[in-house]
Swiss-Prot record:
Zn(2+) binds at H87, C142, C299. Its EC number is 3.5.4.34. This is tRNA-specific adenosine deaminase 1. It comes from Homo sapiens (Human). Belongs to the ADAT1 family.
Amino acid sequence: MWTADEIAQLCYEHYGIRLPKKGKPEPNHEWTLLAAVVKIQSPADKACDTPDKPVQVTKEVVSMGTGTKCIGQSKMRKNGDILNDSHAEVIARRSFQRYLLHQLQLAATLKEDSIFVPGTQKGVWKLRRDLIFVFFSSHTPCGDASIIPMLEFEDQPCCPVFRNWAHNSSVEASSNLEAPGNERKCEDPDSPVTKKMRLEPGTAAREVTNGAAHHQSFGKQKSGPISPGIHSCDLTVEGLATVTRIAPGSAKVIDVYRTGAKCVPGEAGDSGKPGAAFHQVGLLRVKPGRGDRTRSMSCSDKMARWNVLGCQGALLMHLLEEPIYLSAVVIGKCPYSQEAMQRALIGRCQNVSALPKGFGVQELKILQSDLLFEQSRSAVQAKRADSPGRLVPCGAAISWSAVPEQPLDVTANGFPQGTTKKTIGSLQARSQISKVELFRSFQKLLSRIARDKWPHSLRVQKLDTYQEYKEAASSYQEAWSTLRKQVFGSWIRNPPDYHQFK
């Protein structure tokens, strides 16, 4: 039906053609990360491939995001008008929610071209059965999925581990982030790298299912800029300090790619030991900030949550019969481990039970493309040669949604690019995908639906604040509570007063 390379190429072309220069990295000096949601439509009468005749599908990018930054907790605001987390995956998901809101509006106003059809209960909708959604990311998600075995012939991509820093890697119960002074020096696999990675012979196994772990190595890049080779493997992470398995070419696992995301209070914590035993896998982690701690969970953790609760969030669950799940995740060319992805996104939650009707741990298909994002850290590093100055992450984030009004949204530091201190708090200083604006769009949608056609969850009581609307989505809240009790008990949640806006 489709391949990982086809998804990656579609997203790269969309980024190059549909997104303007504004918000993109400065050539040879900045890099960024890319994520997107792709809608795949199969012919209604042919949902499956057959050996003699593959099904022809229609692929469309419906949301896209770029970004590498988070704001610190001291910059968070209680009126919902700032983006706390601007990592590409989160921007793409919030942009996807804008798209879903628009599609629900089309359905509610009886338009024929909506992705939704009426559900079995009054006032709710469900996704058409000929549609699925695939999530693309140019890089492995930060956090648990980025703890990847490293072979001895690979250049060291992370900063040295100093014992005084390692011993300070834990966090107090009252805080939620990194050791002092580390400031994102050791990031996910697309983080700053001081040496070019060597090209290893071989061809990437580009399509692997969640049930198997295959050794992968990258050969010549198929399209885009010439890049340094990036090697990946799928050796077990647990017990790497004493691992004796030998990879092809007699290369031992000597270290792991580091994630800058730090363990949350209540988790066991990393050992901080030099080499392969540095990280403990499977833990909840918080994204790093520069100086000021953040309250943003890692992308690995958020994507694992989406795989149980859906991508629609609590608000939209009022209007949906079932959660909106991703069918597959495709990762671009980068350091990668199938085992780490499987563990981080699926394995940690696979034994969750007693979820409400419609919710469940999804059999997410996880694949990797052989195509490199041309504005990724490693691609820019390879092209810039002796360019003066440091290579730094782009400070802007781009949101794009397949909606007719203001599809593009460019932000920096959580606000629309160009926002000044004087304009903060005004309507023009709000991102289209901020909590308050998504809530406003949700309320606007409700205003276009006759009250007697609202779902029961919205008619049973008077709701006023963002928090009240979220809490009233009872099935979603029950599923989220179950997930926290059974697996994610240390998940950092913002206090209710951050959700009291109207």
